[in-house]
Structure formats: C-alpha cells, structure tokens
Amino acid sequence: LSATAIESNLRQIYPVLMQGFKTAGLSVGTPFFIKYCRVGVMNDIGDLLTPDVLILLIGERPGLGRAESMSAYMAYRPQHGDNDANRDVVCNIFEGGGTNPLEAGAFIVQFAQKMRQNQASGVKLKLAAG
C-alpha cells in the first residue's frame, strides 16, 4: 500500500483530527505506525486496546492511479471476526482532485461522534442512524 499517501496527507489531516476530537471532548490514544498493515489489523488493535472508535489512515494501492490517495477506515469497537460490513471508510483523500485532507479530517471527526452516539459502525450504523 502507498506510503506516499501518508507522507502527502498526514501533515494536513492530523492537526484537524486532533483539534476536532479535542473540541468534541473525545480522548485520543497515542497514534502509532504499523509497517505493511492491511485493514484487517483493525480487529487485532481492537482486541488489544479496546477503543470505542478506531481510525486507520492507510495509503491506497499504488496501482489505483494516485500514489497520494489515502483512506480513513473507521470502526466502532472493532474485534476479532469483524469484516468490511462492520467498517466505514472515507476514501480518495488527497489535495488537488480528491477529498481535501482538511475537509476529510472534519468529516472523520463528525463520523466518529456519530459512531459513539449510535454505538455502531458499518451497516449497523446505517440502520441505527436511519
């Protein structure tokens, strides 16, 4: 997956996320880096750290045409056995043609709040939120 995507977008999106979570009264654990991870690692992280909401910033596959395209995968209380139906994603985050990183950061904060309010993510969130 594309490391260029993280390098290209993290400086813009990270401060928006941190400020947004602070303003919303949401606590944030220590961010960390996982080399060569895939989206399924969210289940392992969920089992170990038991967060209410987990957000994974990950570069899209370089073969998709834009090496700087990043996605934010999100899950409410992820755990072993969860699959894509239990997750939400904000994709195609990059400046100059994709979702602007600043706008994506604000949206991710709002979405995390929605997950906590409804205690759900993925298909369950869509059903709970109507």
Identify the function of each model-found stretch.
Residues 46-57, 61-64:
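Hydrophobic alpha-helical bundle architecture
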Residues 62-68, 73-130:
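C-terminal functional extensions of proteins
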Residues 30, 57-59, 75:
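Sparse, context-dependent recognition of short Cys/His-centered cofactor- or disulfide-binding micro-motifs
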Residues 1-4, 55-57, 91:
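Short glycine-rich or small-residue beta-strand-to-loop segments that form or flank ligand, phosphate
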Residues 1-48, 65, 73, 87:
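Conserved mixed alpha/beta catalytic, RNA-binding, or beta-rich assembly cores of soluble enzyme
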